[in-house]
Swiss-Prot record:
InterPro entries for this protein: RsmH, SAM-dep_MeTrfase_MraW_recog, SAM-dependent_MTases_sf
Family per similarity comment: Belongs to the methyltransferase superfamily. RsmH family.
Name this protein carries in UniProt: Ribosomal RNA small subunit methyltransferase H
GO cellular component annotations of the record: cytoplasm
Top EC group: transferase
Short name of one Pfam family: Methyltransf_5
Amino acids binding S-adenosyl-L-methionine: G36, G37, H38, D55, F86, D103, Q110
Its biological purpose: Specifically methylates the N4 position of cytidine in position 1402 (C1402) of 16S rRNA.
Length: 308
């Protein structure tokens, strides 16, 4: 456990604590509990706060449970996708919920585990957050039709040469299926000379999003979050696709006028805002945090305060 404490660094930890400063009691939902770093800090700082922690990774949840031992009786951990579990919690605890945290990053424990398939050197091609899920990265890469690969590379990886890469993968797998993440990573490296980022980065991102239905789950969550009352919602994203969804959802929450944009005059009474955006621009890690934890460099945090 001491090793986990030293290796795991929660992204934007001080900024998260600052965002939830007004919270003194009630329930906080950590929708992506991970190893429990943010939750542990919040429970330590706020003795009257209770926690509902959600994660689909059973292994990570076991570690989080051990780390939260000192707060026995103040937390309840749930397994499963966060959109579904959040909706259930909202139905039963709506008046008690004072804060909601969503950290959309992959934990260092998952990234560094060669048996999970998230990193370029893994000896599996998996990428599942939920190990009970039927779909894994190997099925996507070795079985998806070329048209489907093109779509996920274009939409989830924002890859310019999405057609070329999809066709090259199809040509290669017809001769010899990809056996693990290293095999795929080495192959992608042979196709590109891009030195700014590893050639496999965007393909791995796209496949991971597909395997875990990440954007669909985020959309479902953001739609459900509209029903929050008096709560602070804090979302940390790690790439432009996630951040755009969060940014647009927050703008939508803050709209006073809900008339058709083509209308010449407002007829809706112009008072429909669900609350206020607390971050005009996203909060990003300090240079010092990036220096200490390079994986934090793409993090962006947005915060919204819902009306009671």
């Amino acid at each position: 456990m001491q090793e986990i404490e030293s290796l795991h660094q929660s992204v934007l930890l001080q900024e998260v604590l600052q965002a939830f400063t007004p919270l003194e009691e009630g329930v906080l939902i950590d929708c992506t509990l991970g190893l429990g770093g943010h939750s542990k800090a919040l429970l330590s700082q706020k003795p009257h706060l209770k926690l509902i922690g959600i994660d689909k990774d059973k292994f990570a949840q076991e570690i989080a449970k051990e780390r939260l031992k000192a707060f026995e009786g103040r937390y309840n951990l749930l397994s499963g996708g966060f959109a579904k579990r959040f909706k259930e919690a909202l139905e039963t605890h709506n008046k008690e919920i004072k804060g909601v945290l969503v950290d959309l990053g992959v934990s260092s424990l998952q990234l560094d585990d060669d048996n999970r398939g998230f990193n370029f050197h893994s000896h599996t091609l998996d990428m599942r957050m939920d190990l009970k899920s039927d779909l894994n990265a190997q099925k996507v890469i070795n079985s998806y039709p070329v048209v489907a690969l093109e779509k996920i590379f274009r939409d989830y990886g924002e890859i310019k040469e999405y057609k070329k890469i999809a066709h090259k993968i199809a040509e290669r797998r017809a001769k010899k299926p990809f056996k693990d993440a290293k095999d795929l990573s080495d192959f992608l490296s042979s196709l590109s000379k891009n030195k700014k980022i590893h050639p496999a980065t965007l393909v791995f991102q796209a496949v991971r999003i597909e395997v875990n239905s990440e954007l669909e789950e985020l959309k479902e969550f953001l739609q459900c979050a509209r029903n929050l009352k008096g709560a602070i919602l804090c979302v940390i994203s790690f790439h432009s696709l996630e951040d755009a969804l969060v940014k647009n959802a927050f703008k939508d929450y803050a709209k006073n006028c809900i008339c058709d944009p083509s209308s010449f005059q407002c007829t809706c009474s112009n008072n429909h805002a669900l609350g206020a955006i607390l971050t005009k621009k996203p909060i990003t890690p300090s240079p010092e945090e990036i220096k200490n934890n390079r994986r934090s460099r793409s993090a962006k945090m947005r915060v919204f305060q819902f009306k009671p």
